[in-house]
Swiss-Prot record:
GO molecular function terms listed in the Swiss-Prot or TrEMBL record: serine-type carboxypeptidase activity
The protein's name: Carboxypeptidase Y homolog A
Major localization class: other
Record gene name: CPYA
Catalytic residues (UniProt): 269, 460, 519
Glycosylation sites: 122, 213, 508
Propeptide feature ranges: 18-128
Phylogenetic lineage: Eukaryota, Fungi, Dikarya, Ascomycota, Pezizomycotina
Length: 543
């Protein structure tokens, strides 16, 4: 769902984190994007500290002295979720990646080659046909189940809803919430899915669901998020990308009736990290059955160096809403940003855990902390934060609903309990240096092949529209000059009435600001968000 600020401001460093030189180099081509060093065993902190350069140790010690509470030692990995795996006979479909990899075809040169690229032999997918009448979430055809990686004991939960309109021809959309560590079932029941959950646990129909004109897959990832589970962990974005490619490959192989339609990846918040990597992973496979046509990122975190500069303006009345902080607090943030920027630049240059973790902890405390301490909602600058730690009571209602035995049985969930956000995962990603890595560097490669939409509700603080617009304009790509010349134009529902936002577009790149929308645009502006989706999928901005 969102960037979890409680983990942002705590960031408790554990007794074991990644070694200093676990470096993720960003690719000149999709095929160069590899998991690489991230698959290596984690070292103990005490051992890894011995490898630090003097400069890196000085930075680490400096930030640790500033925020000692953020460097308390704690268990790095959470305990695995209790679960009970269902017998294969309880599933309607099971497809194995090894069977797909054994399919060979003859190419135009007469040579034999695999029909589909990728390392799939360790994966399988189990599917259950969900009876729409049992839960009443929607009347459309639904499937749920797990992608299994048997070698690493990873099990990712998904829930598919067919389009309400014309499923044989309508696009297919994958939705990803952020966190990292927040369930995409939050997006299903709070934002863009077929129904929401009321305070008393009832189902409420959503007329603006994104499956109005598209089939939608909601995926709980990485492992140990939502209904997903594993005895191991995924603590960086690139590692998670391999699972997404496998899931989609197996899904479209099992259900070829959806494979010919256009496919799009969408998400919000930390999905600003996920989506560039996941899309590039898909595009790196030239022989694939995934018809990826575009990506959509809402209120995302993609380029920290550019985006963190805009926390002070947003908090101090320059983002279109009244100031939350007073003059002295704003001045303190002005003074803090140069150090923050320097730390992020070090992270960008080295992509090292020992540079990126201090950057995350310093910048989050200095640039987000002053705002959060006011009690104002970081996801909506117009409101105070509610009683829930993530500011929305609806999360408690959704969590209670998804913990009902009859709900878990209906969708085939195998874990003992559901939680909306797993803060251990949030911390793990931060402590692997993933938070501040320059994922925007992947975007030019995407733009060379597919359209990219960056949209933002204008009332969000945590991933605000100022920063999102700024990074799209700062991005170096062949179309940068023309994109920056493009004017912001009114965005209207059906082209009529008052503007619900402003949009600029050039080539394959589009930025859209939604008026009076917070971090979760479909929650605050459901009609505008559906209009945005439908027009985007129709190619209005990039055809």
């Amino acid at each position: 769902m969102k960037v979890a600020t409680s983990a942002l401001l705590v960031g408790a460093v554990s007794a074991s984190v990644g070694p200093q030189q676990q470096v993720l180099k960003f690719p000149d081509s999709f095929s160069e994007l590899k998991e690489g060093a991230w698959s290596k065993p984690l070292h103990k902190l005490e051992e890894s500290l011995k490898t630090l350069t003097g400069e890196a140790r000085a930075v680490w010690d400096e930030v640790a002295m500033m925020f000692p509470e953020s460097f308390e030692k704690a268990a790095f990995f959470s305990e695995p979720k209790p679960h009970t795996r269902k017998h294969d006979s309880e599933w309607d479909h099971i497809i194995k990646g090894a069977d797909i990899q054994n399919v060979w075809v003859e190419n135009k040169n007469g040579d034999k080659e695999r029909e589909i690229d990728g390392k799939l032999e360790n994966y399988s997918m189990r599917t259950k046909k969900v009876d729409p009448s049992v839960l009443g979430v929607d009347k459309v055809k639904q499937y749920s189940g797990y992608l299994d990686d048997e070698e690493e004991d990873k099990h990712l939960f998904y829930w598919f809803f067919e389009s309400r309109n014309d499923p044989k021809n309508d696009p297919v959309v994958l939705w990803l919430n952020g966190g990292p560590g927040c369930s995409s079932l939050t997006g299903l029941f709070m934002e863009l899915g077929p129904a929401s959950i009321t305070k008393d646990g009832k189902i409420k129909h959503n007329p603006y669901s994104w499956n109005s004109n598209a089939s939608v897959i909601f995926l709980d990832q990485p492992v140990n998020v939502g209904y997903s589970y594993s005895s191991g962990q995924v603590s960086n974005t690139v590692a998670a990308g391999k699972d997404i490619y496998a899931l989609l490959t197996l899904f479209f192989k099992q259900f070829p009736e959806y494979a010919e339609q256009s496919f799009h990846i969408s998400g919000e918040s930390y999905a600003g990290h996920y989506i560039p990597v996941f899309a590039s992973e898909i595009l790196s496979h030239k022989k694939r059955n995934i018809n990826l046509q575009s990506v959509l990122i809402g209120n995302g975190l993609t380029d920290g160096l550019t985006q963190y500069e805009y926390y002070r303006p947003m908090a101090c009345g320059e983002g279109g809403w009244p100031a939350v902080l007073d003059e002295s607090q704003c001045k303190a943030m002005d003074n803090a940003y140069p150090r923050c920027a320097s730390l992020i630049e070090n992270c960008y240059n080295s992509e090292s855990v020992w540079s990126c973790v201090p950057a995350s902890i310093y910048c989050n405390n200095a640039m987000i902390g002053p705002y959060q301490r006011t009690g104002q909602n970081v996801y909506d600058i117009r409101k105070p934060c509610g009683s829930n730690s993530l500011c929305y009571d609806e999360l408690d209602w959704i969590q209670a609903y998804l913990n009902k035995k009859e709900v878990m049985k209906a969708v085939g969930a195998e874990i003992s309990s559901y939680e909306s956000c797993n803060f251990d995962i949030n911390r793990n990603f931060l402590l692997q240096g993933d938070w501040m890595k320059p994922f925007h560097r992947i975007v030019p490669g995407l733009l060379a092949e597919i359209p990219v939409l960056i949209y933002a509700g204008d009332a969000d603080y945590i991933c605000n529209w100022l920063g999102n617009k700024a990074w799209t304009e700062a991005l170096e790509w062949p179309g940068q000059k023309d994109y920056n010349k493009a004017e912001m134009e009114d965005f209207k529902i059906d082209g009529k009435g008052e503007a619900v936002g402003q949009v600029k577009s050039s080539g394959n790149f589009t930025f859209l600001k939604i008026h009076a929308g917070g971090h979760m645009v479909p929650y605050d502006q459901p009609e505008a968000s559906l209009t945005m989706l439908n027009r985007w999928l129709a190619g209005d901005f990039w055809a």
